């Protein structure tokens, strides 16, 4: 299983919680050089498993273990080896997660083994999930019971209106929602947004050339001011950059 989605949408946390129901859980992260080397230097899948056991100090038992390969976009070799987990160790539960996989696939020309992996996508929290995170389960039930043409009590309508306005500000990124749910502070959510924005901008340089990364950072900073408007590359480019270069990036 390959779990896809943007950074910081909770992929790793979700897998860890799911794995709590299994006898053993082995997690490796392909942002670490010594872990990536396992997949680039070892080709036999059983030797790969043995190497993972060695660095994790845990036994991997098919049928009882979940092997979690995080940040798989950092290793083409690991992606290619997924088919051999499927073919040679079909009883072993393997979950991988990655961000910006589509970008890597397009820029580097590789693909996932056809018919050997399944995909699930994880998105930011919906409005329903936002209400649940706030602990307002009864209000959520009222929302789910609403039907067109059926009246809604004014207090319920007013509270939902308040929450949807908050949701428009907080958004659905799990950490921002958690900060807001815990404190009720929009400022706390805003601080989280700034941290997330910085981490996203750092990723531009990883997946594009330096010049393109600078264009992307410029667009990223400008987009909030263009929300709701028709895309205009000249406006997004600003005075210092050409619209053609920005469009290409």
Where are each of the predicted segments found?
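Interdomain hinge/linker elements that couple catalytic modules in large macromolecular machines
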Residues: 132, 137-249
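Sensor-1/coupling segment of RecA-like P-loop NTPase cores
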Residues: 87-109
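Conserved catalytic segments around the Walker B and adjacent sensor/switch elements
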Residues: 2, 21-36
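Hydrophobic positions on the alpha1 helix immediately C-terminal to the Walker A/P-loop
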Residues: 14, 18
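Short glycine-rich substrate-engagement loop in P-loop NTPases that contacts/grips substrate
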Residues: 32-65
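Structural recognition of the conserved hydrophobic beta-strand(s) that form the central parallel beta-sheet
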Residues: 68, 93-99, 121, 130
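Short regulatory helix/loop adjacent to the ATP-binding pocket of P-loop NTPases
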Residues: 102-119, 131-136
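Conserved lysine of the Walker
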Residues: 11
């Amino acid at each position: 299983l390959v779990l896809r989605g943007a950074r910081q949408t909770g992929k790793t946390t979700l897998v860890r919680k799911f794995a709590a129901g299994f006898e053993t859980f082995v997690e490796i992260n392909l942002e670490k050089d010594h872990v990536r080397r396992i997949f680039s230097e070892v080709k036999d899948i059983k030797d790969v498993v043995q190497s993972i056991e060695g660095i994790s100090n845990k036994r991997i038992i098919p049928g009882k273990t979940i092997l979690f390969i995080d940040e798989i976009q950092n290793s083409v070799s690991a992606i290619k080896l997924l088919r051999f987990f499927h073919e040679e160790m079909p009883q072993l539960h393997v979950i991988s997660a990655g961000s910006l996989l589509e970008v890597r696939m397009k820029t580097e020309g590789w693909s996932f083994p056809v018919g050997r992996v399944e995909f699930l996508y994880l998105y930011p929290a919906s409005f329903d999930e936002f209400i649940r995170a706030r602990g307002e389960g009864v209000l959520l039930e009222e929302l789910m019971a609403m039907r067109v043409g059926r009246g809604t009590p004014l207090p319920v309508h007013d509270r939902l209106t308040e929450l949807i306005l908050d949701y428009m500000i907080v958004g659905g990124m799990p950490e921002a929602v958690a900060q807001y749910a815990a404190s009720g502070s929009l400022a706390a959510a805003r601080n989280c947004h700034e941290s997330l924005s910085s981490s996203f901008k750092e990723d531009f340089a990883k997946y594009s050339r330096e010049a393109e990364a600078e264009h992307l950072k410029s667009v990223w900073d400008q987009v909030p001011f263009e929300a709701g408007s028709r895309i205009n590359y000249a406006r997004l480019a600003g005075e210092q950059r050409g619209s053609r270069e920005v469009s290409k990036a």
